[in-house]
Amino acid sequence: MSLQPQSETLSFEAEVKQLLHLVAHSLYSNKEIFLRELISNSSDAADKLRYQALSDAALYENDADLKIWIDFDKDNRTITIRDNGIGMSREEVIENLGTIAKSGTRAFRELLAEKKAEDSQLIGQFGVGFYSAFIVADRVVVRTRRAGMKADQGVEWESTGEGEYTLKNIDKPTRGTEVVLHLKESEEEFLDPLRLRAIITKYSDHILLPIVMKKIKTSGADDEDKNETPEEEVVNRANALWVLPKDKIKDEEYKELYKHIAHDFEDPLAWVHNKVEGKLEYTTLLYIPARAPFDIWNREGQRGLKLYVKRIFIMDDAEHFMPMYLRFVKGIVDSNDLPLNISRELLQSNEVINKIKAGCVKRILSLLEDLAKNDKEKYASFWKAFGQVLKEGPAEDFANRDRIANLLRFASTHNDTDEQNVSLQDYISRMKPEQNRIYYIVADTYTSAKNSPLLEVFRKKDIEVLLMSDRVDEWLVAHLNEFEGKSLQSIAKGTLDLGDLEKEEKVETEKFEKDFDELLKQFKEVLGEKIKDVRITHRLTDSPTCVVFDENEMSGHLQRLLIQTGQDFMQAKPILEINPSHPLILRVKNESDKTRFNRWADLLLNQALLAEGEQLKDPASFVKGLNELLLDS
């Protein structure tokens, strides 16, 4: 076994360099948050030690009195944040202080490359954390040792926040981490004990761990004994905010607790605080973030709530309290009815967990319902951030399907905008008296849906159609068949059936069918295996053709999604529908030249496929045939 080098210099990952630059230049107006972030890290370290010590008490090393110490030295211009939490090994120092978590590296790079995200958005998504130290410091030294390791396995990390950092082995008799900030010339304000106390009160009063500082000496106090150990005092409340009555907690305190537990830079969008008493006793404090995290679509990523048992931290990311479609929710569950040594495996089959989960879901859905009813602007912000995730709900949560459906929002032909602000209840309130279905179309983009020829008869009759273009929409409509007794109907599948709304058109179509029987046979003969069928339609008013799919087959949009994800399936063939009143169809009907007829048949099918969003298998042949028809005209 080779010994670790005594000292070495390593380079930061490229993403860390960029994050350091952002932190140093973009957070200067709110520079005091460095203390909040470093205290939060120390608090997390204590939580991890408590949890691991449940199964290995020796990790406490005869010191179970966990604290955070804050000190400063005016002469040397330093601030020190020290804890006796879990600490770090050499490998953990490199992983935690030299890299961004691998799950976030690619997303961070993509956001930077796009140049779309504001600096605050990047910082909010990836966390400021330890790197906030460089807002006020031009040199940072970290000394740490992991609990359970030998005293000579301590590590010292040092950097000026530029391209490199140095590591060396040190002796560290006590476990935990010490962060020493060498302040920039312009940051003397933080060498004031009153200023530091004010920041702690503002951001970290709720931290469960005692935060300790030296007592401020009053003027005239005896200062003769220079060697006397200064007296210490706890400068935060050090209690669990969530156990206090709601009327005793200020909004700012709720917001700061959120930033601590979610490691977010922004205020939450909304929250709900609830205490349940009776046979089952637990407290929940649940937050909805203002912005989606970078890994929201990684269903395997870390998610969940912080779990406490009788105010003792048990685990981060306890995913069993929230279904996948609410994976964006952050917060705390504190139960009196779970054992302290509960594991993730036991969480899966615990009846108490199931009851708490049902309560958490109920609270979040009620919060969203309240926002949707009483604060439409805030709900619109929520929908923009998390609407696509909520659309997974009807497939995953049958018990709450109707409540979730009532929260869904869509674009529609009623509004000339891609903003998703139409609820299913809005749609029903505008339905025609004779109408008994909720009509929708799913397309690759909003523009493609809005301009689909399939909408022509609906516009003619002033029937609203929901315009869906999110990737999750096919999954949604497959599991949401009806709402308030009205069935959902795709206008891109099956034959058109508007009931009493289309009596005249049906009569007219029947007249055309005999006259166009020969033309339909010719189309079938020419197009062969490319199509399933050809038929007359009355759904078109301006376009010559369109394609649809059988009622029980997958839509073209769903088939394209499956192809993109590499799925193996039996592809459905389109049905070509023709508008018997369109001049192009009448021209083709009278075409006597077989070659030209074949070109027209191909052209009419391909343009219908393009309008449906399909990518042509042979676009060059399509262009060639089109050019030949233009030259013949």
From Swiss-Prot:
Which parts of this chain are annotated as the region B?
Answer: 345-560
**Localization of this protein:** Cytoplasm
Gene3D superfamilies membership:
3.30.230.80, 3.40.50.11260, Heat shock protein 90, C-terminal domain (1.20.120.790), Histidine kinase-like ATPase, C-terminal domain (3.30.565.10)
Which key words tag this protein in UniProt?
A: ATP-binding, Chaperone, Cytoplasm, Nucleotide-binding, Stress response
Any one cellular-component term (Gene Ontology): cytoplasm
Q: What's a single GO MF annotation on this record?
A: unfolded protein binding
Q: Tell me the segments the record calls region A.
A: 1-344
Check the record and name the PANTHER family matching this protein: HEAT SHOCK PROTEIN 90 FAMILY MEMBER
As for what it does, the entry says: Molecular chaperone. Has ATPase activity.
List the HAMAP family hit by this protein, alphabetically.
HSP90
Its quaternary organisation is: Homodimer.
Protein name (Swiss-Prot/TrEMBL): Chaperone protein HtpG
The record lists the lineage as: Bacteria, Pseudomonadati, Pseudomonadota, Gammaproteobacteria, Legionellales
